[in-house]
Each structure stands twice: as C-alpha cells, then as structure tokens.
Amino acid sequence: MAIKLIVGLGNPGQEYMFTRHNAGFWFVLHLAQQFNITLAPDKKFHGVTGRGQIHGHDVRLLMPLTFMNKSGQSVVPMVKFYGIDNDELLIAHDELDIPAGSIKLKTDGGHGGHNGLRDITPHIGNDFHRLRVGIGHPGHKSKVSGHVLSKAAPDEQIAIDSALSAAFDALPLLLGGDVEKARSQINGFKLPE
C-alpha cells in the first residue's frame, strides 16, 4: 500500500521549534515547503494539516499541536476520519537510541519509550511505518528531558539534516508502496566521512 498520511511529531510553539524533539516536525515542514503544500491549523484534528501531491501521490500531512505526550489526540481522529490503514501511515519522530546523522525506517514494534508513540499505539496498534530520526542519547536517563528539549549543536544539526535528506530521497519508493526498497535505502544511509 502507498503512504497516504505523513505525521511529524513534535511540540508546538516557537520555543520548541528547533529542539531535537521536533525532528518529526522538520520532516513534514520540509515536505510542505518542497512540494508547495499549504499547512493550516485544523481544530478537528488538533494540529496543522495539509494535502497535496508528493511525487505524483495524494498525501496528507499532519503536525499535532497537542504537545508530544498527547499526540494520539491528533493522530487517531485523523486516521479514523479518513480511513487510513496502518500500512498507509508514516510517523516521523526523534529517536534517542540512534545517533545523530542516522535514520531508520521501521514497521511494527513498541513505542520504545517515545511519549508521542506511547500515546498513539493503544488506539491504532503498532503496525505502522515509523521514520526514526536519530538525535543520539545524552548518556544517562536523567539527562534525556534536557537533551530532547534543547537545540542540537551545529555539527549535530548538519548530521540530522543529512539523514533527513536521505529519507526525502527514498520518498518516491515509499510513496509508491515499495517499502522494502525504501527501508534498504534509508537504513543504509551513512554520513560522508
């Protein structure tokens, strides 16, 4: 099945826009900009939504404005309203367990401690596609909150942006339903030495 809904997880507000936790937002914002998709507030879905053509495919975009730990209040109603099957859903989110500059496409699995996913999976299950954008781990769990809610260092940001570019390059495959080729291309991305 082709992807019909791309969700970017993050926190609303200018103070959070450039924090690591908003890597999912960055992905959706880039898509909207690149493909001239207008994003507008949508009260019904507690988020910012858009719809347009991406590589010849009709795709909806969503950025929840509920704060990360309430992402399900935005994602679940949209999935249900439009009848989006889980294999037509891609959720982009930051991932502590992957170093900055790495990116992984995964289907299935638990929430892995990610509060946005934790709020979504009880309602729709966990068999949807996730674009896991590496932001690295600060080393100790007591530092996680400060890490995800702060800006990446300039070299880290360049690495994250490079990984996101690799995902953009694989979008034609993913949107066309060739998930395995897209996964191979995305998961095989390595930063230049």
From Swiss-Prot:
The gene is pth. PANTHER family: PEPTIDYL-TRNA HYDROLASE. InterPro entries: Pept_tRNA_hydro, Pept_tRNA_hydro_CS, Pept_tRNA_hydro_sf. One of its GO terms (biological process) is rescue of stalled ribosome. This is Peptidyl-tRNA hydrolase. The record marks 11 as: Discriminates between blocked and unblocked aminoacyl-tRNA. Keywords: Cytoplasm, Hydrolase, RNA-binding, tRNA-binding. TRNA binds at residues 16, 67, 69, 115.
